[in-house]
Amino acid sequence: MSEQPHKQRTRTKRASLHEKQDQVRATLSEELREEYGQRNVRVNVGDTVEVMRGDDAGEDGEVTDVDLRDAEVFVEGVTVEAADGEETPRPVESSNLRVTDLDLDDDMRVERLEGDNE
């Protein structure tokens, strides 16, 4: 693997979608870390997250959309006001989030979380 920054950025940008899933991971809260024995997890729609960095730091909200192509996460309540006054969702990088509550409707996700803990 190359050490050159422009090649690193190109590889990240051109990654296929199954590889980009690793780019939308966020750290777990302390309670969830102890419960599942993991430090971070892939962000899914329905998870409750806290924004840790940026203008919206401290905001809590539910994940409304995850864009794998651009590796962006959209959080309920994190918006930017357009010039005409309309509120539009602001994309947040997953590294700037902390997952405080997981959406466990997916059985496969539950198995994956609990399987690493054994």
UniProtKB/Swiss-Prot annotation:
GO molecular function terms listed in the Swiss-Prot or TrEMBL record: RNA binding; rRNA binding; structural constituent of ribosome
**What SMART domains is this protein classified in?**
KOW
Ribosomal protein recorded as keyword: yes
Per the record, the gene is rpl24
Q: What is this protein called?
A: Large ribosomal subunit protein uL24
Q: Could you tell me the keywords of this UniProt record?
A: Ribonucleoprotein, Ribosomal protein, RNA-binding, rRNA-binding
Q: Which domain of life is it from?
A: Archaea
Q: Which GO terms describe its biological process?
A: cytoplasmic translation; ribosomal large subunit biogenesis
Origin species: Halobacterium salinarum (strain ATCC 700922 / JCM 11081 / NRC-1)
